[in-house]
């Protein structure tokens, strides 16, 4: 996998068996040959390539990539600016505007480069088939990533929106890290506790209290 040269590799190799790693490689080869898969193959591991373990300050968990053409870029919730923001991302930006201020761009690459690990639990999706790759090969890898941050990382903020993301809470050492939970930003649930949750300012407060640089969320 392209992750072999990254800071994540030792933890992935420790948590996953060689068979599991090989299954991921084979899965990628077969899926991208047979059908339209998102994100583009070279961006499947974008979150882990852009945000190293030692630089991770915040983790924002997603479920799986957007399944529309041109949307997914390997970062949870993020889409290129050339593509309209999906409803959940629109609500994330609304909450950010209320919490800290307005952000013009809905491409969240700058967050990733600052240390926000934008991690989906499932890293691929077939076109038009949301969550179709859940339960196949990805969860052991992404669960290992969460555990790596919890075990080896400095004090970090885990932002878990919705029940699915919150199911990952069991992998996090809350004596060392901050876990922020709220309803999912989907239009179906955003008014049931997502709006008004102030995750961005709370994250920065925790980071500065623990001697880490805050995130410039508006950049």
From Swiss-Prot:
Keywords: Cytoplasm, DNA damage, DNA repair, Hydrolase
Gene Ontology molecular function, alphabetical: uracil DNA N-glycosylase activity
CDD domains: UDG-F1-like
Enzyme class per UniProt: hydrolase
EC number: 3.2.2.27
GO CC annotation, single: cytoplasm
PROSITE patterns tied to this protein: U_DNA_GLYCOSYLASE
SS bond partners: none
Pfam families to which the protein is assigned, alphabetical: UDG
SMART domains: UDG, UreE_C
Main location: cytoplasm
One GO biological process term: base-excision repair, AP site formation via deaminated base removal
Compartments where located: Cytoplasm
Catalytic activity: Hydrolyzes single-stranded DNA or mismatched double-stranded DNA and polynucleotides, releasing free uracil
Active site (catalytic residues): 64 (proton acceptor)
Cited function: Excises uracil residues from the DNA which can arise as a result of misincorporation of dUMP residues by DNA polymerase or due to deamination of cytosine.
Homology family: Belongs to the uracil-DNA glycosylase (UDG) superfamily. UNG family.
Name of this chain's protein: Uracil-DNA glycosylase
Annotated organism of origin: Leuconostoc citreum (strain KM20)
